Amino acid sequence: MGVSSRIRSSVSPETLRALNQGEIQEIVSDYRKTVENALEAGFEKIELHAANDHLLQQFLAYKTNQGNDQYAGSIENRARLLFEVLDVLTEVWPAERIGVRLASGSYRPLPAVGCYIWIV
């Protein structure tokens, strides 16, 4: 990958690695807390971002999700985190006021179409 900025950062890039179950549960809890904060702040709707190489999209992608656990492999497993987050969000927020942003454009090869059809 190329450098996206000519400005030097004091933060070193981290080597990608699979998340463990505890880290995944922390992430799900973080999504819940974020939605609780949005509700308290008076937001009327929320959008769960699962596109543009954000974390949830990385779990959906064959290219980035090459693990061998319950979150990898089949479409059902790769979508598991997305649905776990949605389950937690709908405990706090009305489902009809939650949108999900999906984008298959960054996937290569394109078995992603089947993934998105399954999710929707």
Regions found by a protein language model. Give the residues of each.
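Aromatic- and acidic-residue-enriched carbohydrate-binding clefts of CAZyme catalytic domains
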Residues: 1-18, 58-79
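Non-globular sequence segments
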Residues: 1-36, 41
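Generic structural signal for well-ordered alpha-helices
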Residues: 31, 35, 82-90, 120
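Surface-exposed cleft-lining segments at the edges of enzyme active sites
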Residues: 32, 39, 68-76, 109-111
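Conserved, mostly hydrophobic/aromatic
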Residues: 38, 89, 100
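Structural preference for beta-strand elements that scaffold enzyme active sites
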Residues: 45-47, 97-101
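Glycine-rich beta-alpha junction loops
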Residues: 50-54, 104-106
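Non-catalytic scaffold segments within catalytic domains of secreted glycoside hydrolases
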Residues: 76, 99-120
